[in-house]
Curated annotation (Swiss-Prot):
This is Cytochrome c6. It comes from Euglena viridis. It holds the Pfam family Cytochrome_CBB3. Functions as an electron carrier between membrane-bound cytochrome b6-f and photosystem I in oxygenic photosynthesis. Binds 1 heme c group covalently per subunit. It is found in: Plastid, Chloroplast thylakoid lumen. The gene is petJ.
Amino acid sequence: SGAEVFGNNCSSCHVNGGNIIIPGHVLSQSAMEEYLDGGYTKEAIEYQVRNGKGPMPAWEGVLDESEIKEVTDYVYSQASGPWANAS
């Protein structure tokens, strides 16, 4: 599931939708609208997962296609729900 992929690969930096490396670049909808190339869209989230940026590594070739899709969907859904007020 997307939650499992996130927990196993992303949560060390993005615990509860936050960001321990770059404060402010959290995984809330409003924050992603500001800093993510393409804004808060599944396409923009997937691009970031695949290619990385700055200190975030690229996950293409590490995660398989289904894992990339699952974690993209998970981040997208959490961003406007439980992580809406992430800091």
